[in-house]
Amino acid sequence: MNYLNKIRIENPLTICYTNDVVKNFTANGLLSIGASPAMSEAPEEAEEFYKVAQALLINIGTLTAQNEQDIIAIAQTANEAGLPIVFDPVAVGASTYRKQFCKLLLKSAKVSVIKGNASEILALIDDTATMKGTDSDAYLDAVAIAKKAYAIYKTAIVITGKEDVIVQGDKAIVLANGSPLLARVTGAGCLLGGIIAGFLFRETEPDIEALIEAVSVFNIAAEVAAENENCGGPGTFSPLLLDTLYHLNETTYQQRICIQEVE
């Protein structure tokens, strides 16, 4: 847990331009791992914030015509500042509007990580792909999708699901930790985007080890929280997840991590 230990010591400032539904949960999750979240949205202050921040999360869950230009502006300012961006294209396949905006953003600015479920990432590489919302039940080959997305966008790809896939450079990793309760809590996936950002430490081309650790810390914490005798369902799971992120130790991490490199 080299990266998590560093976070707990250095408290990296992590800027989150995220959706209205999840701001509180995302901020509390980042605080739980030791990061310092700032939910700054104004392009007018971005240049000053980005000089001292360690990463930027952009999550388009509540995209509107009113915030389109702000998102593009802060992404470009982050590029100018050398600040890595984690981009979460929430429900990109649910509407033509979202898909067009996401593609515009990816043409307008360079992001360091694209994080989404298989349907969302597929929508970024296949104009015919559709989905029902933030999740899809369709079986998809996440490794193949991640590799194709990496080839197109030349940026690290994190695909979440029952198993999580990370592709960076010539490496493809499958992770198999987590809990079904994550799908019953709104904003869990959005929090993961924030946690990934917290692990970047101004690395615009992040080491795959940082991404592996970020995803594994989150999912192992979810496993432990779900197994807690006080966890009765989604309502008790959420605070237990935060507590477990706060207390997670090296022994638990090493005992539970389930990782496989694939071709």
From Swiss-Prot:
Pfam families, sorted: HK (PF02110)
UniProt GO molecular function: ATP binding; hydroxyethylthiazole kinase activity; magnesium ion binding
Residues binding ATP, per UniProt: K115, T160
InterPro entries: Hyethyz_kinase, Ribokinase-like
Reactions catalysed: 5-(2-hydroxyethyl)-4-methylthiazole + ATP = 4-methyl-5-(2-phosphooxyethyl)-thiazole + ADP + H(+)
Annotated keywords: ATP-binding, Kinase, Magnesium, Metal-binding, Nucleotide-binding, Thiamine biosynthesis, Transferase
Enzyme Commission code(s) on record: 2.7.1.50
Similarity remark: Belongs to the Thz kinase family.
Record-given protein name: Hydroxyethylthiazole kinase
Organism: Staphylococcus aureus (strain bovine RF122 / ET3-1)
